[in-house]
Amino acid sequence: MSRRAMVIKMPILMILISSMVMTMVESSRSVNNGHDDSEILRRHLLTNGLGVTPPMGWNSWNHFSCNIDEKMIKETADALVTTGLSKLGYNYVNIDDCWAEISRDSKGSLVPKKSTFPSGIKAVADYVHSKGLKLGIYSDAGYFTCSKTMPGSLGYEEHDAKTFAEWGIDYLKYDNCNSDGSKPTVRYPVMTRALMKSGRPIFHSLCEWGDMHPALWGSPVGNSWRTTNDIKDTWLSMISIADMNEVYAEHARPGGWNDPDMLEVGNGGMTKDEYIVHFSIWAISKAPLLLGCDIRNMTKETMEIVANKEVIAINQDPHGVQAKKVRMEGDLEVWAGPLSGYRVALLLLNRGPSRTSITALWEDIEIPANSIVEARDLWEHQTLKQKFVGNLTATVDSHACKLYVLKPVA
């Protein structure tokens, strides 16, 4: 494809996507007019003091599914500390589905499962907090959660929010299964208001799967919003989710982030290079970096990927701008996004079957044409000796990437 054809094609695609979803957004606005919109809007950006940068931590679902208990959660908290991951910013320990009994108690409260959480969630929260970490919990904007093994919070939003606050919960992943048929744009703000009244700042993660494009309405409602369906530990799943999430790049900002789902790094379904691509794209996309492997038993290879301080720094950059695709030529892609300090994050991605060279042009990544640029390779941990003018070209292996920070020096 010629560069002109490519440049024209991308805006047209964005226009088509935008026009497709605008009717849905207007509908959601009209639905919400019956609520106190000013109360919801107070949550916009930083009003709960959370999500200034994308959250980092761990979630139980990808590796353990429903096979969780308080011993494993405590051991995971221990591992975050002993591995040094907590010092890098991985501070959330998030319990996913299946933690509660199927029935509420006589007061209408959720009951931690006696067989797996005999000490209760508050005791687990106290332990996690004693390690300098934060505890996350899971619920659902329906009558039951997705596993159907425990109740959802539909109709109990205020009661459950107060319970979570009393337990010391710091993060709520709020799923979208088994509802009453009403739209997420109706059900999710109810929990938002309940959390605001709970007396405790709780990060609100909207797990709506992207069905009604929550990137377009999520910022007054939550601190992050899923833009896609669930990830699987395969190259095809990961890369297709990255594509879908990128469409909504302009909606990410401090206080509210696009969420392409938890990380699969370390679960064994991809190669090392593919996991590096996975972690790199999530980092430049300002996605939540929630580990989904068993961090108690991480390999050295996995640790080297998820503990890359330079890549994490891109994700946590205070500028808070999600990177976008700026050039696509067949299986070759150039992603770029601005960073603080007049720097640029640059990803060269080879989705194809063979090793090849990829070129990034300054005009595509909004660097002045005659600028002399220094390039830092974040996976090789070295600043390239060569200075670059006008473009940068690198040879990239199949299903692999190069990740740089570019800094104009003249």
Curated annotation (Swiss-Prot):
It is an enzyme of class 3 (hydrolase). The keyword rRNA-binding does not apply. Substrate binds at residues 96-97, 173, 208-212, 226, 230. GO terms for molecular function: alpha-galactosidase activity. May regulate leaf (and possibly other organ) development by functioning in cell wall loosening and cell wall expansion. This is Alpha-galactosidase 1. It comes from Arabidopsis thaliana (Mouse-ear cress). It is found in: Secreted, Cell wall; Secreted, Extracellular space, Apoplast. Keywords: Apoplast, Cell wall, Cell wall biogenesis/degradation, Disulfide bond, Glycoprotein, Glycosidase, Hydrolase, Secreted, Signal. It catalyses: Hydrolysis of terminal, non-reducing alpha-D-galactose residues in alpha-D-galactosides, including galactose oligosaccharides, galactomannans and galactolipids. The active site is at residues 175, 230. Homodimer.
